[in-house]
Amino acid sequence: MASKGETGILTLYSDVQATAVRWLWYPFIAVGKITLLQGDPGDGKSTMMMNLIAELSKGGKLPDGKAVGLSQRVIYQCSEDGVSDTIKPRLEKCGADCRNVAFINEETYSGLTLDDERIRQAIIEFRPRLVVIDPIQAYLGSDSDLQIAGRARKLMQRLGMWASVYDCAIVLIGHLNKKEGTKGLYRSLGSIDVVAAARSVLQVERDPENADVRIVRQIKNSLAPSDGEIRFSITAENGFQWLECEIAQDPAAEPETPNFESKSEKAAYLIKKLLSEGDMRSREIYMRMSDEGISRRTAENTKKELGIRSYRKMRQWYWSIQPEE
């Protein structure tokens, strides 16, 4: 006999608890979902993303001025530039905290593909809030992978599952095809299944009235109203600069980090916020606390006050707010 909420292989929607979409950057990049950032080569896609990564990694501000809050970890996997002579200097120039930005070394782990199990393992170990693949075309098993509908669909389903299960946003950076005059959604390289799987599609274009300015338009949003556009400039004199952007606020957003009267009060807020996303290694929590000016001793005392339990798994200690089973 089927249990409550089930009829054979079916589950009733009445037994599903509805949850709000969580955003890394509303309404452009959602946590647990795939976002596609596309544009012509040289239009600043990677530069824009590196500047966003920098703000996330140091707990800075989003382009609309909203505070990031806690510093976030990011995996930035890029095959088009040298790690030591290009990517690292560019991240540093953007002001990134490179202790929170990682990559899979392709000199050691060659042949990396979009649905590679090593990417999943890296996500499990590093627990990033954002994973960026730049460009998507460089991480295909063969040139035809994005062209064949069935293969592209399976690739995207696998990535989407990783984003959901491991609670991170995945951004795929892609080049546009040369079909001028066609609708933006159909200018992505490869099968339309790639665009179909992405919950948000952002397209970078040059401002026709100012070659130094880029306009980022959201040409697809399956999770929220498409509202506003992003602008940034790239000049020899000033480098990269975010320009004014008017973006609607996430109606389900939490209030920004409050002011604290003591280190213990701040530690309690941060620990509860970190563990609300799931159990976390104690070593990682201590590191996050240190980044926020909280000592190990204060973190341990606060843990006791909050009744946080710890347990050992695979030779590592974890903290949890969940009751012991």
State what each model feature region is.
Residues 3, 10-13, 19-20, 24-26, ...:
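Conserved inter-motif catalytic segment of the P-loop NTP-binding fold
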Residues 99-102, 200, 309:
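Conserved beta-strand segments of alpha/beta enzyme cores
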Residues 2-10, 41, 124-127, 165-166, ...:
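C-terminal regions of RecA-like/P-loop NTPase motor modules
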Residues 48, 52:
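Hydrophobic positions on the alpha1 helix immediately C-terminal to the Walker A/P-loop
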Residues 57:
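Gly/Ala-rich phosphate-binding loop of Rossmann-like dinucleotide-binding domains
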Residues 36, 42, 47, 77, ...:
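Phosphate-binding/switch region of NTP-binding enzymes
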Residues 29, 37, 53, 76, ...:
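Conserved hydrophobic/aromatic pocket- or pore-lining residues that grip, position, or stack substrates
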